């Protein structure tokens, strides 16, 4: 398997999300932080649903977590993930049992839109 780099955007569109005030809907209001937290919560839900992860999957999990945290701290709108880590992230979104809502839908669109897939 090739180990290409996949690019994941952290610019989540918050327009039209109920329960958010106007300040939070502005493009610069930590959209990357919100997107990163949603992605990390989905990964946690996936891991909990499986009652833990294998060592190989934990390494991918930590890689994605650390990459997202660094991107938020550095105010990056896009992150690069190795194809293995990106595949693991997509698996988390596919297999985790989640309650559908509009903001999750938008986060799923970011993951589905990773360049290179």
Regions found by a protein language model. Give the residues of each.
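Positively charged, low-complexity terminal tracts
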Residues: 1-117
């Amino acid at each position: 398997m090739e180990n290409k780099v996949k690019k994941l955007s952290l610019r989540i569109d918050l327009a039209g999300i109920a329960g958010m005030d106007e300040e939070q809907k502005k493009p610069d209001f930590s959209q990357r932080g919100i997107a990163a937290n949603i992605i990390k919560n989905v990964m946690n839900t996936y891991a909990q649903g499986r009652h833990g992860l294998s060592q190989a999957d934990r390494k991918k999990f930590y890689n994605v977590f650390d990459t997202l945290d660094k991107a938020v701290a550095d105010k990056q709108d896009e992150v690069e993930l190795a194809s293995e880590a990106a595949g693991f992230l997509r698996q988390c979104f596919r297999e985790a049992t989640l309650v559908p809502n509009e903001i999750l839908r938008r986060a799923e669109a970011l993951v589905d839109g990773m360049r290179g897939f």
